[in-house]
Amino acid sequence: MNNYFTIHKLFTAKKNLLFLLSFILPGLIFFSYFFYTKNGVLTVDLGQQYVDFLAFFRNNLFSHPLRLIYSFSNGLGGSMLATDAYYLFSPFNLLLFLFPENLLPQAILIIIGLKIATSGLTSYYYWQQKINMPFYALSASSAYALSGYVIANHFNLMWLDSVILLPLLINEIDRTLRQEKSHLILITFLLWFTNFYTAFMTLAFGFLYLLTQIFFFNRKKQWSIFKSYLIKSILGSFLDAFMLLPVFIEMLQGKAASSANWSWGFQFIPYNQITKLADGAYNFHEMQEGMPNIFIPLPFLLLTILYFLNKKINWKTTLANGLLLLFLIASLFWTPLVLLWHLGQFPVWYPGRFSFVLIFLALNLAIIALNQQEKIKLWQVLPLAIVALGLILFVTFNDQSFDFLNENAQIATGAFLALGLLFIAFIYNKNNYAAIFFYLIIELELVINLVLSLGNLAYQKNYDYQNFVKNTTQVTNYETNHDQSLYRTEKNFYRSDDDPFSANYYGLSNFNSISNQHVLSLLNNLGFVNNSNSYTNFGGTPITDDLFGIKYYILPNEEITPLKEKKQMKYDNKNQRIDVGDYHLQKRFNQLILMKNNYALPLLFLSPTSTKKMKFDPSNITKNQTQFLQAATGNTTLFHNVIWPDPKKINVSSWDGGWMQYSKKRKNKSARLIFNLRPKTNSSYYLELPGDIDDNAIDMYVNGSFVNLTVRDSNTRLINLGSRQSGQRIQIAITLKKDNLDLNAANLWRLDTKKLAQEMHSFKQIQPQITQPSALVIKSNHFSLHKKMTMKSTIPSSINWLVIDNGKILHKNKVLFANAFLSFNLNPGKHQITLIYIPWILIIGLLISLITLVIYIKINKSISVSVNMEK
């Protein structure tokens, strides 16, 4: 008996050790790369978007939880529910609270590493049930956790929860197929809850997997299994209604509102996908415009092929799995299937976001092949050798077409294909240490692939983010402590479009996959640089500052003594807004200056004009801004056209009969145009540039200072040339980058800032004071009207806003102010306005979730009662 317990303890200890290894090793390999390279983890969207959302989550979950429902940090103001559901609802994010704010980048790295480690654990849990040799399961779990998909998308950390849960989903489907008790409801709930986007892909694969397996049962059993699967999947989904319903509505209003162009063609030449099987098949171009990442260790690739050469496996099972595999492969490049997997939208960057399910299936087939313990014959090795040779030749002869196929990648690919063949032909099933040998070569290849892949990327320095947050938060905290009204803040530089989330202020800029299309359209018409899911403060004027309620501006403090690199704040992406220097100096900080715009309107303001639908011309920004101003205040035109001065031409000639159209004389030499403008007033001067004149067409300097002309979409925009420079020279120097330059649609404008200040001063005198007592409530003070007026706002319209005047509900105007914002009419008399944001769809979703929970509990009770009665 003692021997039995000793053996049992040893077996249990070994089993636990293997589970521990499946968790520790993938995470350790990932962490080691960043430890030895001393890289920060912030790069691309993680550094420019997700880190800001995570900072917002950390700052508000326990202190201001209602901000996770609605926030004015979200662009000009918007619901946060879909953003929460997409980016923030992973339970791993709670680990952020274990770290101080200044260690947020390091905390994110730990979260990513733990997610990778956990995906190794869950996949090992699944595969160790499928094979008698645990080291093969351990190899597969590491291959899954550090696959090409995970390495390429490690910074898209919100997708990794689905990678973790996929093996558990398939495990529960297997239990359903065996008609055993399963936790399919729980796994379905967790998938939707952690990230609805990749949850759709995971659950779609689970459904396809079920179909391939259920095919072999008799009709009666098929229906019984399918019914059980369907009921549990529906219950799990309806439990998430509190989240899925708001997401669905917001997606209809946001990203999904734009339609994709369906076609029957391919996204790229299908056979080029073969290159993504090579080691290190990843770089920045692949991230942006490349092909889906499908790398698995090459010995596993050969074993996946071996699965289809195995005679022990039933041919019907082989056929079903083969069809599923082909379907997933076709989904990588065939347009209809690409759109199907990505919810009807082409992925912007990061192609093939579902490819982790293909990787899982391939590894699963390889594990099945390994578990057959079949004696490998020559006729099976030959096709594998041909595939290996073909892959090596394809990679070698296409190295000039794909930057990632460098010499190291080619050597690694050839070496591990050779090791894979060596293992299958001479070691597998012939040596007691075959599984350990296989495990070691898999881990080695995973390390090499990780180093080659991530070595092609550039990462931001952690201290750049930390310096930004430390300094800007110092300023915004000062604002909050000294000004209790509701206002917006902006900067003439930015670290990311989502700076308001990290620095805790209400701004204008925003980068979000789910954007308000009405707001986006308005900002485009007003000249702000934007694309389909982001917009910045670049392109604004004192008119837009006043109307949008931008009361404070944060500027660099240029007068300080330069600090050490790790302490010096970077003023990246500077906005050419010279005129913000005319605002009132509020306070100097260590590295920043706070300016106050005394003419900024409150976010709710009284207007003498009624709300009418506005027609904007995207190519005429000054007209649009004038129209915006007139609709708000009723004021007159303040923009005046300025005649272009004659340019000094260097290696440039004018077109015959043309106006402001130029060509290079000698194409191989530098060509420049220099315009010298001498203002006769202290007004603010602007250059209106059409969208096709960007940093690819010209370089531009104003009084020797470089002007950033980068656009996102082809946006016409205004560039501030100078302010309060009467009698002084403003020099515009343009260097041609192409042979021809057409400035026919470019215009010079003068904004009468003195008159604007006078009119806004008078207009502001009649405005009520607006405060925000809580995240979902906005209040005015008591005020009186002698005539009927319209209360307009720069708060994006939503059905969720309830307007109350002295305790009575008011009807909102159906016609939106500036085609985007909330407005309502007020009669003469005394008023106190209260706006309450009530998330109706969230409430309906919560009711559905609660009803589903009650139904689930009752079903469970009735099942328990019937089981007890049978006993």
Model-predicted segments: where are they?
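Start-transfer (signal-anchor) and selected internal transmembrane alpha helices
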Residues: 1-33, 436-438, 854-871
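Contiguous transmembrane helix-bundle modules in multi-pass membrane proteins
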Residues: 198, 345, 349-471, 830-871
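Membrane-interface coil-to-helix junctions
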Residues: 23-123, 142-163, 244, 251-256, ...
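Active-site-proximal, structured, solvent-exposed surfaces of multi-pass membrane proteins
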Residues: 53, 636, 640-871
